[in-house]
Amino acid sequence: LESISVSVKPDNLSRIEGIGPKLEAMLNENSIYTFRQLSDAAPAQLQGILDKGGEAYRIHDPGTWPEQAKLLAEGKIEDFEKLTLELKGGKRVD
């Protein structure tokens, strides 16, 4: 049988507060390329991906990544920008 590959246009995941180029590459290696895919991922699943990367990645907190990605996937740019003002390194700050 021939395998059918579906071409997905990747989003710039580093737009997410807390994700830089190395984390974006790690997500891509785990088949997360789009804001929609990231928004559908559970924070625990994302933490598992980070944990596999070792200590340097384990310290990151992906708790808000799906929420941020959902806003971008839905084109809610103003809401996304408001949310990112409340975040530092992807985490909510009081």
What does each model-found stretch correspond to?
Residues 1-17, 21-94:
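C-terminal extensions
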